[in-house]
Amino acid sequence: MKVYLRNKEIKKILIRKNKSQNWLAHRLEISTGYMSQLMDGSRHPSPQLRERIMNNLPENKFDDLFQIQDEG
């Protein structure tokens, strides 16, 4: 099972909050390059990072922010 960011939803959330992807990367304590990889789906957030994302975007549910894909 792989978990991906719902990049379109996260972009909408950031626009509503008048925040940038770089702002979120800073809040998550990750590099902007890693944030870009998460957003384009080439990297997958760890359980710990998913928790930090949820904590920084608390008005959103897990299913709003992440998509689960079965491997195989």
Protein language model features and the residues they cover:
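Short, charged recognition helix plus adjacent turn
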Residues: 32, 47, 63-72
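Short alpha-helical "recognition helix" segments of helix-turn-helix
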Residues: 24-25
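Short, basic-rich loop-to-helix N-cap that marks the start of a DNA-contacting helix
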Residues: 42-55
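A short, Lys/Arg-rich alpha-helix, primarily the initiator
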Residues: 1-20
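DNA major-groove recognition helix of helix-turn-helix
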Residues: 14, 39, 49
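Recognition helix of helix-turn-helix/homeodomain-like DNA-binding domains
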Residues: 30-44
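Helix-turn-helix DNA-binding elements, focusing on the entry/boundary residues of the two helices
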Residues: 21, 32, 50
